[in-house]
């Protein structure tokens, strides 16, 4: 595309966005602005500045690329639309890194039409104090997670609980505890509808040291779902440090679900605990 034409389209998009009341919030840890208002010219210096903002449909949170931002982003109760989603993404050169220490990094709770893309989230480690999930989505719908890297979480790299209509694509989840990617819902139901997981890699999600009565250390796990597709994904090197000899884990699998499709995937070199009696590469488990 002609560079001048591209810039013209970009400028028109920005002007149109402001005309429609869309707000942009910028975070840059290198900001030296004396009066940070979250604008591109005077960005917030830390993620803490986002805590007092009541987010609206169409808002965009821009995180400065090629730097580490410490803290969390928590978005709750935002009912955005497909035309005006709330977006969390990087800007500038490179990808932004969120270090959330012992907590989850990005939490989306009771929301609709939220997009998270082009960010890296990192916790303190599955055995070093973290108890959270990298991208944690709770009872939310029409969620898109794209080109995310998540590591260092005791629970999941990306975790979906309840809700539905979720797409997870082109993401790399590694060195987490419970699972690389998990989708789950209310026990005894198949109430989480329309899940798509594609072109993702789950590697070295070794096991959760806090779970001593069930499996942990799977690559991709889907449960309590109706209508889900997992395709063009790879799971490898997971499960080797599950802290018990019982069931699981598995590279890519599902349970208690209807209309689950796993296709064009590669699951290899996954393991169970040294005394483990179960596990596998792929599995349609109980309730399928």
Specify the residue positions occupied by each region the protein language model found.
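Right-handed parallel beta-helix/beta-solenoid
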Residues: 18-49, 65-67, 91
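Sec-dependent N-terminal signal peptides
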Residues: 4-13
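Surface-exposed loop/turn motifs in large extracellular/passenger domains
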Residues: 80-87, 107-117, 135-146, 162-169, ...
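Beta-strand repeat architectures
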Residues: 51-59, 79-81
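Right-handed parallel beta-helix/beta-spiral solenoid domain characteristic of secreted/periplasmic
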Residues: 33, 44, 62-71, 79-133, ...
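Extracellular beta-strand/beta-solenoid scaffold signature
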Residues: 74-76, 99-107, 127-136, 152-161, ...
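Surface-exposed loop/turn segments connecting beta-strands in extracellular beta-rich domains
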Residues: 71-72, 91-96, 101, 119-125, ...
